[in-house]
Amino acid sequence: MEKYILSIDQGTTSTRVIVFNKDGEIKGVSQREFTQHFPKAGWVEHDANEIWSTVLSCFASVLTESNIRPDQIAGIGITNQRETAVVWDKNTERPIYNAIVWQSRQTQEICNDLKDKGLEDEFREKTGLLLDPYFSGTKVKWILDNVEGAREKAENGDLLFGTIDSWLVWKLSGCKEHVTDYSNASRTLMYNIHELKWDEQLLEYLTVPASMLPEVRPSSEVYGKTANHHFFGHQIPIAGIAGDQQAALFGQACFESGEAKNTYGTGCFMLMNTGEKAVKSENGLLTTLAYGIDGKVNYALEGSIFVAGSAIQWLRDGMRMIQSAPQSEEYATNVTDADGVYVVPAFVGLGTPYWDSEARGAVFGLTRGTQKEHFIRATLESLAYQTRDVLDAMEKDSKIEVKTLRVDGGAVKNDFLMQFQSDILDVPVERPEINETTALGAAYLAGLAVGYWKSKDEIRNRWNLEKQFDPKMDETKREDLYKGWQTAVKATQVFKK
């Protein structure tokens, strides 16, 4: 009987469940979108129960459509939108408030207050993160401070906190297992990434009781089994967990120090494996845990670019210059260059390495000769320039030269963008045959834990190249173009809202 691994890819706008076979091939996919809640400007929330419902719905449809029985599933892996925080009552088994999403800015005042107390350096030193609403810790504090009766319940030990992976494992296991993995714990602002434990001092600053927190476990391990009522009585091992970007790093087989991947989604997230050493960034990067497996942990440097694929959506929906995302490539290749035009898509500020939340988008270099094609090309090029910003910071911090960049996500289908990316980095760009690297990474972690795959070497050998883009641009042109980008970013930062 052929066996499979089932991967839950719980994202920001939808949940997907994907079934993989031994060769890492996709045998079935099911996807469900869910509601985005915006209670106030800058706030983003999800209904955690609705997310759970989408998971169950995807389970049912993917098994039915792929004609796979529950007893053929060897294990379940989970990858998730990181930082999004859920607080639930362990007695009623229900969330006490909506999940506060990673994008939500509703805890800015809490962050400002902690900064005013001079605590930013301590948080940075222990967690590798910035004091920013992006991360989970201040979201948990906000819920305890703002939901009636929450703090009292928390002090009495009745409330549990988890990132989305924790919530799903708890529900899948019939409310038995309250766990998370190293990669997700490292995004909470409450976990000491050097000592590998929840940090009592940071919890005190955030006024979060330790009793709420999940047990932190390796990313590849059997955490428990599914409850009898989920898969017609079949108890399936829940065996792999990683935050979405770390799962993509694993799915891209970036197991060695210096290996890096860039995911081109709504934004771009670039991670470089730094091995068993946590590298402190002096250049605006985050230090994070990549994964824990085989009794040890790997660290990573991470750069966040806020606007990537969403810039292409903006060309389509906001500027109405294109009718579909693939059309951007056609227009970009109709001209030989951007004719001196630079688009800085700082629609929600600038991420790594600038961390300038006040910056706003700008366009430079327009002349009477500027055409729509130049504007579209310059927008695509901005994704590559921002990636260069991050890669340069990574090489400075790690003292490691990146030899190749592995890529995944929706925008990597754009051959023009991938070639320009290689040119502006002066590094080969590798696009894999299987683009679903996030879900695949979670599947690999689960499969290793249950013996479905034997080793990381076996997984590395299963990684297949679809296309490699080699740099073709001469150094003078490359550096001139990049210098223009740096000038444009500086000018953008001068013009504040």
From Swiss-Prot:
One of its GO terms (biological process) is glycerol metabolic process. ADP binds at T12, R16, T266, G309, G410, N414. InterPro entries: ATPase_NBD, Carb_kinase_FGGY, Carb_kinase_FGGY_CS, FGGY_C, FGGY_N, Glycerol_kin. It catalyses: glycerol + ATP = sn-glycerol 3-phosphate + ADP + H(+). One of its GO terms (cellular component) is cytosol. Glycerol binds at R82, E83, Y134, D244, Q245. Pathway: Polyol metabolism; glycerol degradation via glycerol kinase pathway; sn-glycerol 3-phosphate from glycerol: step 1/1. GO terms for molecular function: ATP binding; glycerol kinase activity. Activated by phosphorylation and inhibited by fructose 1,6-bisphosphate (FBP). Its EC number is 2.7.1.30. The phosphoenolpyruvate-dependent sugar phosphotransferase system (PTS), including enzyme I, and histidine-containing protein (HPr) are required for the phosphorylation, which leads to the activation of the enzyme. ATP binds at T12, T13, S14, T266, G309, Q313, G410. Sn-glycerol 3-phosphate binds at T12, R82, E83, Y134, D244. Belongs to the FGGY kinase family. This is Glycerol kinase.
